[in-house]
Amino acid sequence: MLENEGYGSTFGDPANDPYLARTLVRRGALLENYYGVGHNSLDNYIAMISGQPPNPSTQGDCTSGFDAFPSSSRSTTWRGATGVQQGTGCVYPARVGTLVGQLAAHGFTWKAYMQDMGNDPHRDGAPDSACGHPSVNGPDPAINAVAGDGYVTRHDPFVYFHSIIDNAANCRSHVVPLGTTSGTMPKSDTIGATGLAQDLRSVATTPNFSFISPNVCQDGHDYPCANQRTPGSSALADIEGFLKVWVPRITSSPAFKADGLLEITFDEGSGSTSCCGEVPGPTNSAPGGGGGPGGGRVGAVLLSPFIRPGEVVTRAFNHYSTLASIEDLFGLPRLADAQTVRGTFDRGVFRTG
């Protein structure tokens, strides 16, 4: 997931980011009308892995504290979607479903790779480099980047679910540092966690589902960057640098060549435009913070051996569509607001023969 760029400044103006908007688009499928679901960052990340709509806390990135939902809050059926969490909070009750919980229950593997997690274990809340998060109902010290550490909690949606963090050992084995391209992990690692480069070496070690969060410099969020060792010329240049390093490693891996799919998108753009019949959740009348309920048009590119290179898809999608598409591909039931979308990545995107 990348940060804070609307379609017009990226895919709509390839001179700004030629590797993403020209090279990768020519190799895959451009989703021209792909939208965020709110502002600021966190609610978009949460939506993509759980289908939960924005609430006032997640809309504000939970910067005031890593607060749990009140014990009195309940899940409800909301405008056609079941399992939507009521109330305001940051850390969702254990009963709230997630994509990775579904995957694990059906025998699939998953991993979330967080760049810079564990660089400063005390700050990140990751004593052994992995599963970094604040104490529940405590302050979040990892809101902004510091020298040498650009991990921020709000770009790691997995730690906002009790179903993940309450099993510390399981969380530490699944929510891990990205590592370097040579496979080196932070010095704080004491559990033998493996990063993306090492996991990509074989089909057997590559998770069925992976989620990658660059640090807040390389995802384009910050410019200039407190954690940046070699300054780039712009936020988009920093994004390009990250993609040029990691996309070839992913697409040349045995698992990707066999049957992989890589999605590259942004959390939110400018404005509050939306698609796909998105409606506000039960506790937030304006998740877009403006005249509409969404997070603006951001676009996305999909890469896969099963995609016709240079495909341009004009149908509308959003982060709930991504979740619904992944659930459909794995034969899983749809969670929360993923139940409300009609458009998914289907035969209109993939070639089947």
Residues covered by each model-derived region:
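N-terminal pro-sequences and low-complexity stem/linker regions of secreted or lumenal proteins
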Residues: 1-353
